[in-house]
A protein has these predicted regions:
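An acidic intrinsically disordered interaction segment
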Residues: 11-17, 119-126
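Basic, alpha-helical interaction scaffolds
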Residues: 129-131
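Basic, amphipathic alpha-helical hairpins
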Residues: 133-137
Length: 137
């Protein structure tokens, strides 16, 4: 006789249910030259699929300049002005979205996270298949 497995929701599920996040895809493909991202009340999610990137910030607490040399996810949970500097000939491939957190700047999830998370894609096991589906969209 089988018994149903009771699952207890974790604390994060409750927060995400109450403070929803909406993503709006706005770019997929090459970015060449200088691209500045500055949208008030929005976060950003960028996936560098191939190529490399020089990234700059003017905000306190973030590196002025960063070099990203492998496929990576760049997650800005809150508004932070950031600029991509890409070679004009060899455009790096990106998928980019804005993120809108319910509650705006007061969203507890967005406030609890650091201003920037950079995650090389190779560090996340099994992510290749999910990203392949995303990039095919």
């Amino acid at each position: 006789m089988s018994h149903p497995i009771e699952s207890t929701p974790d604390r994060l599920s409750g927060l995400l249910e109450r403070f929803r996040v909406r993503a709006h895809l706005f770019h997929t493909g090459a970015l060449c030259g200088i691209s500045r991202f500055d949208v008030k009340e929005r976060g950003f999610l960028h996936v560098l699929r191939e190529g490399h990137l020089t990234l700059s910030h003017s905000a306190r607490g973030l590196p002025r300049r960063m070099e990203i040399r492998e496929p990576s996810l760049l997650f800005y949970p809150r508004h932070v002005i950031h600029t991509f500097h890409n070679p004009p000939v060899e455009g790096s491939q990106f998928t980019c979205a804005t993120l809108e957190f319910a509650g705006g700047a007061m969203n507890p999830v967005a406030r609890a996270l650091p201003p920037l998370i950079v995650l090389p894609l190779a560090r996340v096991e099994g992510l290749d298949a999910a990203l392949s589906l995303l990039f095919a969209e």
